[in-house]
Amino acid sequence: TRLSRYLSPPLFPVLIRDLPCKLTLHEIANSKFSIGPFKIQSGYVIHPGPTVGFRVGNGKSVFTYIPDHEPALGEKGIIPDKRWISGYDLAAGADLLLHDAQYTATEYLSKKGWGHSSINDAALFASLASAKHVLFAHHDPFHSDAQLNDMFTVFKNENPYPFKNELAKEGMLINLD
């Protein structure tokens, strides 16, 4: 499987068959299924390689996970019509949305089509989807923590979105009902 190729040397130090667990893999793109009390919807999102986002709900709250996503459509940017926005159905009304925000708006100009989002496009996507709380993730590995904090401060000062938004950080815990 594709996952077996990624979870093997040289990309990953351990072979998938050597993991200390009973692992069952399923193809789940563009599907709906349940695991215990959780209803899960998966769907392809715009990215050069096959990439899936997830919507997980428990009847009380919804968490949407879209880590690799470019919602803008080239020079047109984000078309504010939910029928044309990749990932919209996954993110609509989410209580918590974790979304790709790898670039600043300026950096994104030279990286269109790479499959990642600017923080500005991620915020616009979240706003159009009426997400309540957004975690900006998939930070550019060339940005230091200090640079990320500075970039986020500039973004917040220039973009007063009505939803709660913050940078995703290692070790964060967020409670959903």
Identify the function of each model-found stretch.
Residues 72-164, 168:
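Cap/insert and terminal regions of metallo-dependent hydrolase folds
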